[in-house]
C-alpha cells in the first residue's frame, strides 16, 4: 500500500511541476525555441509518416497490369497471347513463346511491337530459317508482320492476329482496375507544412547563422513541387508517388545542407531544380524507344569525354581525384556517368543478340573501371562494378559467367588495395574504430557519427541543434548519422524505407515492361539506389568500410542530386500504370479512348 501511495505521489509531483517548468522555459533566453523544438519534433514525425506511408502504400498496392497485345496462332490448334512488346520465339523453355517442334531452333527469332502498333519479326540465325508469305527472311534482318501473314519457323506455320475490340475494352478496364493512384494534394499540403516548420526550426537551431538563402531555397522547392504536379495534372497524369518521395528526401537534403553549410543551401536548391528538369527531359525522351537507342553513340561519347576531363583536370579531395573545379563550382563527373552507363548498358531484345553491341559495352565498362582506378574512387568503382554485373546478368542470363567475373574482380580489387594507402587505411580501421589507435585517427568520423546517431534518439534533437553538423563531411558521407541525430531514428528509417520502396516497385514493374530496355534500365537504377544507400548507411555505422558514397537525394552535393533525379527517370519509365507516368505515351495506355469503342 505504501508503494502504491509513493507512486501516485510521484505522479502528482511530476504533473504539478510541469507549469513551473514551462514558465521557466518561456522566461529563459530561448524559451520559445525550446518549446517549439520540443513539439515540432513529434509533428515532423507525424507529417513524415503521413507523406511517405501514403506514397509507399500506394506504390506497393498498385499492380503494373499485364495486357494482351495480339495473338500468335501456332499450327492448327495453338493460340498464344502476346503479353509483351518484345518476345523471343523458339523451342527453349525460357522463350516467351515456346514452340515444341524440332525444326524450330532454341532461340529462333524475335517478334516485337513499336509505339505505332506495328509488329516486326527478326530471325536470329536459326538453323532452318524463316519465311514470310513464302519469301525467305535473311538472318538478323527485320520484316514487318501484318495480321493474317503466314510466318514459317522451320516447318511450323504461325499467324499473327490482332485482339478484338471487346478485348481492347477489357484491357482498358483491367488497367484502370489494377491501378491505385492516390490524390497528391494531401501529401503536397503535408509536405508544405513540413517545409514551413523546418524553416522555423532552422531559425531556432541556427540562431545568428541563419540566412535568407535558407528561406528562399525552401520557398523555391515548395513552388517547384506544386508547379510540377499542377503542370502534370494538366497533362492528365495522376501518379506522383515517386516524385513526392523524391521531393521529401530533397527537402531533407536542403535541411541538412542548411544545418551544416548555411551559405551553400541555395546552390543545393538550384541542383534540385536542375535534377527535376533532367528528370522531366529524360522521361519525355525515354518514351520513344527507337529515339532512345539512336543516341547511344552520343551518350558513349559524352561519357568518355567526362571521364577524360576528370582524369586530366581532376583534383584530389578526400583521397580521390574525382572532382573538377569550374569557376566557383565543383562537380563530380562520375555521378553523371552513372546515367550514361545505364543508358548504353540497357538494351532492347534485338540488341541482346548483337555481339557487336555487347562488345562495345564491355569495352566501355573496362574503360570506366580504368578511369575510376586512376581517380582512386573506391566507392564509385564499386557501384559501377555492381551495376555492370546486374546489366551483364540481365543481358545474358548466364549466372556462372557473372560469378566468375565477380570472383576475378574481387581478387584484382584486393591486390589493387595493397597499392592504395588511403583506401587500405579505411579497410584496416573497419570494425576497429573504437580501438585506442583509431578512435581519434582514421576512425574519428565513424566514432563521432555513431555517437551522434545514438544521441538523437527516436525524435532527434531538432534541425540545426546537433553537433555532428560541425564535423567534416557530415552533410555528405555521414548524412545518415546527421539525419538520425537531428531528425531522429524514425525519420532516418523512413528515409531508407522510401528508397527500398522505389526499388520494390521497380522490381514489380519488370513483369509488365514494354521492352527489355526499360526492364534493364529500371533494375540497374534500382541497384544503384540500393547499393548507394547500403554503403552510406552501413559505412556510417561501421558495418561496412566508409567509402564516401552519398545517400540518394539526401546528401549535399550538386551532381549527386542531379544524378539521383536522373536515375529516378529510369524507374519512372518502367511504370505502366494507367495515367501514372508521362514516360509512357497516352495512346499506349488506352487514354482518351471511350469505353464504347
Where are these regions (language model features)?
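Intrinsically disordered, low-complexity acidic Ser/Thr-rich regulatory segments
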Residues: 2-102, 114-115, 164-174
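C-terminal boundary/linker segments immediately following FHA domains
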Residues: 25-30, 131-181
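Forkhead-associated
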Residues: 80-156
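A structural signal for hydrophobic alpha-helical transmembrane segments in multi-pass membrane proteins
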Residues: 173-318, 562-576, 580-589
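Hydrophobic, glycine- and aromatic-enriched re-entrant/interface helices and adjoining loop segments
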Residues: 317, 321-323, 327-330, 403-495, ...
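Hydrophobic alpha-helical segments of polytopic membrane proteins
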Residues: 355-374, 378-418
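Loop-to-helix entry and N-terminal half of a specific, functionally important transmembrane alpha helix
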Residues: 509-548, 554
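A juxtamembrane structural motif centered on a specific transmembrane helix
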Residues: 534-597
